[in-house]
Amino acid sequence: MVSPVTVVKSEGPKLVPFFKATCVYFVLWLPSSSPSWVSTLIKCLPIFCLWLFLLAHGLGFLLAHPSATRIFVGLVFSAVGDAFLIWQDQGYFVHGLLMFAVTHMFYASAFGMQPLALRTGLVMAALSGLCYALLYPCLSGAFTYLVGVYVALIGFMGWRAMAGLRLAGADWRWTELAAGSGALFFIISDLTIALNKFCFPVPYSRALIMSTYYVAQMLVALSAVESREPVEHYRLTKAN
């Protein structure tokens, strides 16, 4: 079992650019009512830094571990989704929604189907159903179906992220905690987006959405560091 102190020492320095980029976003706080390529870059910059965080572990690591590669690809789609959402008032909200739907599919695939954890799946299904029931009266037209599919996808991703979570014992792994926590923060962020867009104005919505979103993406990226594939496979691949 790797201690939290070891994790901070080994991974913390690689995350410094991400923390700096996140601070830049919140310090500048460019108005969302006036989208521009500059505001798009500033919003996407922390995600770009998470690309670099994963690449800092070596291209060989990504190529040897499909789960880490899928998280990297998910981060790429996230950045595209962020760019679309900057321009959502110009008609690109659905484009952003679709990009993040693809992101959740890549993340769920990275987290894998073992262990199955059916009880966790049932809990996530119930929570997803409650979220959709809360949003349903506010939805109309195509969003009635699009939001329903999106809720199902993020709920599935959350199930797979939390399925392997063990909080104690010799089998405890910090990357599982990172994955589960990241999924939870992602759900909070996206639920806030939906409530604010379709139902009612959420106080301080942008600060809540972006803070939980960046934390979620950081935790998901961290979960890729300790790959789900056998370590021996990576060593053999690296040696060859």
Swiss-Prot record:
InterPro entries: TMEM86B-like (IPR012506). GO terms for molecular function: alkenylglycerophosphocholine hydrolase activity; hydrolase activity. Induction: Sterol-inducible in the macrophages and the induction is mediated by the liver X receptor (LXR). Signal peptide: none annotated. It is an enzyme of class 3 (hydrolase). Residues 1-21, 65-70, 114-115, 160-174, 228-240 are cytoplasmic. Its EC number is 3.3.2.2. It holds the Pfam family YhhN. GO terms for biological process: lipid metabolic process. Catalyzes the hydrolysis of the vinyl ether bond of choline or ethanolamine lysoplasmalogens, forming fatty aldehyde and glycerophosphocholine or glycerophosphoethanolamine, respectively and is specific for the sn-2-deacylated (lyso) form of plasmalogen. Plays an important role in lysoplasmalogen metabolism in the adipocyte tissue and macrophages. This is Lysoplasmalogenase TMEM86A.
